[in-house]
Amino acid sequence: MADGTQYCTFWVGSLYLGTDVHRVQEVMRTLEMTPVPLAPPAVRGLINLRGQIVTAIDLRRRLGLPERPDGQEPMNVVMRTDDGAVSLLVDEIGDVIEVNEAAFEPPPDTLKGEARALIKGVYKLNGQLLLILDSVKTASTETALALIN
């Protein structure tokens, strides 16, 4: 498919989300986190990833969803950003899928606030919607601070 784009997909609550596969460094199970005092609520802590310090951003908190049920540990989608690696904490990892760019739709005008800032667009896939995250804004701790103020 010459006009397709690949996305790494994952679930956060009932939301089926994706981000550009070229930004994804790796996907991992739960890693130990160190809390960061005075950090925005979406920043769950710091992770030592083989000597590299990585900020962990909880997508449930970032998207205004309820906390994970007790005992449910998040998975890590480690992404490369211009400022270094960031881990997005998600509930479940999906697949790498390729979608036709012609099927891409911008978010509806009725989508407002933080969701509008983080969702780049939508694909309709076999009865479900794949929401594409703006990887730069989603992984930015500065955006997390601006959106809560």
Residue ranges and their predicted role:
Residues 1-149:
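An acidic, low-aromatic, low-complexity terminal/linker signal
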